[in-house]
Swiss-Prot record:
It comes from Mus musculus (Mouse). Interacts with GRIA1/GLUR1. Residues 168-283, 286-416 are annotated as: cGMP-binding, high affinity. Residues 1-26, 118-138, 740-762 are annotated as: Disordered. 3',5'-cyclic GMP 1 binds at G232, E233, L234, A235, R242, T243. The modification Phosphothreonine is found at T609. It is an enzyme of class 2 (transferase). This is cGMP-dependent protein kinase 2. It is found in: Apical cell membrane; Cell membrane. Its EC number is 2.7.11.12. Belongs to the protein kinase superfamily. AGC Ser/Thr protein kinase family. cGMP subfamily. SMART domains: cNMP, S_TK_X, S_TKc. The modification Phosphoserine is found at S110, S117, S431.
Length: 762
């Protein structure tokens, strides 16, 4: 025998019951485990039920918080409006019912209005224009390669994650986020230093990488900023003053990006994408001859769809209405053939190639299979319905390209001349009056306008300066003089916008747009001598009434629609519609004023400068995607909402919150009861997130707005001929009656001279 271990034999119970005892013990253990399992199961069910209750409570609380937040925003707006009607000197008691405030309320108040008492008035904002011809200190041409800053992969990931957690930035394209990360640069600050100072102009966005930061408003501590959090993002959209301070409590490191680089990144990526898509479309035989504006609309309609290896994009024999362009990856084309059980490979398609184009003409029975050859294949797609609504049916486009449009235009001109002779006569009379007034003021000194003019009253104030009611000395001829501080224009880099306003207004002559007669300049100001419209501001009437009824709102919307129709035909986008920029003439007709953000663009082109009023800007402006005439249609929808309710639909406790509300969209928003079904439909169709889907931007243009059911039966010809009575007309005692305007204190201080010479051609 070996020395290995020997297994002992089991002892046998003398009565032979050892096996039975073992089985009993096992059975007992099983029963005990089953009881324990049932107990645990019951406990788990109880916890799941409790968790369900907690989730339901959380959902209710979330809804309640959202409702309270919305109510708080509404109360804030109402509070601002109430404060607006309390005058600084001897403030009169508030009216019990805003709906009963008479039209001539301004004749019954005499107190001065401080600048702060107009808090309810919405202010425009703007970044530096993308073309800065008149900025003598403009930066050199942007170079992405020069702007890049080296980082390791872990830093890039942490910065990327921080940017993607931000409510605004997470909506940007992945390529834009990637480029932002590449260009952010590191900054180290010692304890006690300020990353941001309250009251100073902002120009950077930051990500906290190391250390501890706290946020203060005055001396009050508001919060601390966690590591890898993004802050200061409003400053990369446009010029703004910081509303709080951010102080380093320890030594800190941040990653920063300035506004100039951010805006160049946004423009660069969007333009590169548009150019690539345009080249794709130019390669399609059905589309290559379309004009630029049609191609641009198709580009804006294209959506990206992704497929993994083996996915069928198209199946043979199916009906289809979608056209595809391969933007990334490879696909194979297979087709059933005689003598083979399985479809046979016909060819392989790569980036830039297209398929399904017949679907744009009519229902197409697919003649082959298109199958993704690899993961993450990307296709640009557009369906026939979208194509037809946006640019027209293929037959309509063919007629357009064959020259039928010239004949149609001639017929339209004849019909228009026959239908609108009264409005043509009115336009001729307006032009004659304008020429006569221009000849009168042409004799005035270009640098000393007040040798010939005297100031009667202040009509309005703003960050730019003031608007004064002036009259020709010894004559009963009045104008509105816009006095713009040159130093302010240079500080905010708005030279291009001021020149643009001058050039555009010099070109215009419409009964729905304020007229420019002459410009002047001296060492402190540039001046615009404008038509005096003394019926008052639409904003102040809306403020006093609370809201308008539907007939009044329709009249206002119709005036704006006619102004937009005129501007867009000339290739001009307005970009700053709001009640504050609508003024009443002596007949109660509305006119657009303040063309500081207006711009002339070519057919099919876009512009990139962030500008407008926060509550009215369109999503594509916020996201720096480039924008065109469709932003005016978006703002028209917002105006309809504000006229009917007294408040714009998107208004947060700060500008960034307002932008996030806009980006969430109007589609799921509940409308108040005072907006009936038809105006609600108009608003929703004007405020589509996708610009190509907006009413006014479809194939029939602005006529779709005029023919909308809410405006059905409106007297457009009477409006253009100014024979339609205005529901907003108020009596004026003469050409210098300014009683419908708030009263303002005199300007404090004298602005410094500004002698850089940017205004030499003004």
């Amino acid at each position: 025998m070996g020395n290995g271990s020997v297994k002992p034999k089991h002892a046998k119970h003398p009565d032979g019951h050892s096996g039975n005892l073992s089985n009993e013990a096992l059975r007992s253990k099983v029963l005990e485990l089953e009881r324990e399992l049932r107990r645990k199961d019951a406990e788990l069910q109880e916890r799941e039920y409790h968790l369900k209750e907690l989730r339901e409570q959380l959902a209710k609380q979330t809804v309640a918080i959202a409702e309270l937040t919305e109510e708080l925003q509404s109360k804030c707006i109402q509070l601002n409006k109430l404060q607006d009607v309390i005058h600084v000197q001897g403030g009169s008691p508030l009216q019990a019912s805003p709906d009963k405030v008479p039209l001539d309320v301004h004749r019954k108040t005499s107190g001065l209005v401080s600048l702060h008492s107009r808090r309810g008035a919405k202010a425009g904002v703007s970044a530096e224009p993308t073309t800065r011809t008149y900025d003598l200190n403009k930066p050199p041409e942007f170079s992405f390669e020069k702007a890049r800053v080296r980082k390791d992969s872990s830093e890039k990931k942490l910065i990327t994650d921080a940017l993607n957690k931000n409510q605004f930035l997470k909506r940007l394209d992945p390529q834009q986020i990637k480029d932002m990360v590449e260009c952010m640069y590191g900054e180290k600050l010692s304890t006690g230093s300020y990353v941001i100072k309250q009251g100073e102009p902002g120009n950077h966005i930051f990500v906290l990488a190391e250390g501890r930061l706290e946020v203060f408003q005055g001396e009050k501590l508001l919060s601390s900023i966690p590591m890898w959090t993004t802050f200061g993002e409003l400053a990369i959209l446009y010029n703004c003053t910081r509303t709080a301070s951010v102080k380093a409590i320890t030594n800190v490191k941040t990653w920063a990006l300035d506004r100039e680089v951010f805006q160049n990144i946004m423009r660069r990526t969007a333009q590169a994408r548009d150019e690539e898509y345009r080249n794709f479309l130019r390669s399609v035989s059905l589309l290559k001859n379309l004009p630029e504006d049609k191609l641009t609309k198709i580009i804006d309609c294209l959506e990206v769809e992704y497929y993994d290896k083996g996915d069928y994009i198209i199946r043979e024999g199916e009906e289809g209405s979608t056209f595809f362009i391969l933007a990334k990856g490879k696909v194979k084309v297979t087709q059933s053939t005689e003598g083979h059980d399985q479809p046979q490979l016909i060819k392989t398609l790569q980036k830039g190639e297209y398929f399904g184009e017949k679907a744009l003409i009519s229902d197409d029975v697919r003649s082959a299979n298109i199958i993704a050859e690899e993961n993450d294949v990307a296709c640009l797609v557009i369906d026939r319905e979208t194509f037809n609504q946006t640019v027209g049916t293929f037959d309509e486009l063919q007629k357009y390209l064959e020259g039928y449009v010239a004949t149609l235009n001639r017929d339209d001109e004849k019909r228009h001349a026959k239908r609108s002779m009264s409005s043509w006569k009115l336009s001729k009379a307006l032009s004659l009056e304008m020429i006569q007034l221009k000849e009168k003021v042409a004799r005035f000194s270009s640098t000393s306008p007040f040798q010939n003019l005297e100031i009667i009253a202040t009509l309005g104030v703003g960050g730019f300066g003031r608007v004064e009611l002036v009259k020709v000395k010894n004559e009963n001829v009045a104008f509105a003089m816009k006095c713009i501080r040159k130093k302010h224009i240079v500080d905010t880099k708005q030279q291009e916008h001021v020149y643009s306003e001058k050039r555009i207004l010099e070109e215009l002559c419409s009964p729905f747009i304020v007229k420019l007669y002459r410009t002047f300049k001296d060492n402190k100001y540039v001046y615009m001598l404008l038509e005096a419209c003394l019926g008052g501001e639409l904003w102040s009437i809306l403020r006093d009434r609370g809201s308008f009824d539907e007939p009044t709102s329709k009249f206002c919307v119709a005036c704006v629609t006619e102004a937009f129709d005129y501007l867009h035909l000339l290739g001009i986008i307005y970009r700053d519609l709001k009640p504050e920029n609508l003024i009443l003439d002596a007949d109660g007709y509305l006119k657009l004023v303040d063309f500081g953000f207006a711009k002339k663009i070519g057919s099919g082109q876009k512009t990139w400068t962030f500008c407008g009023t926060p509550e009215y800007v369109a999503p594509e402006v916020i996201l720096n995607k480039g924008h065109d005439f469709s932003v005016d249609f978006w703002s028209l929808g917002i105006l309809v909402y504000e006229l009917l309710t007294g408040n714009p639909p998107f208004s947060g406790i700060d500008q960034m919150m307002t932008y996030n509300l806009i980006l969430k969209g109007i589609e799921k928003m509940d409308f108040p009861r005072k907006i009936t079904r038809r105006p609600e439909d108009l608003i929703r169709r004007l405020c589509r997130q996708n610009p190509t889907e907006r009413l006014g931007n479809l194939k029939n243009g602005i006529n779709d707005i005029k023919k909308h059911r809410w405006l059905n039966g409106f007297n457009w010809e009477g409006l253009k001929a100014r024979s339609l009575p205005s529901p907003l007309r108020r009596e004026l005692s003469g050409p210098i009656d300014h009683s419908y305007f708030d009263k303002y204190p005199p300007e404090k201080g004298v602005p410094p001279d500004e002698m850089s010479g940017w205004d030499k051609d003004f």
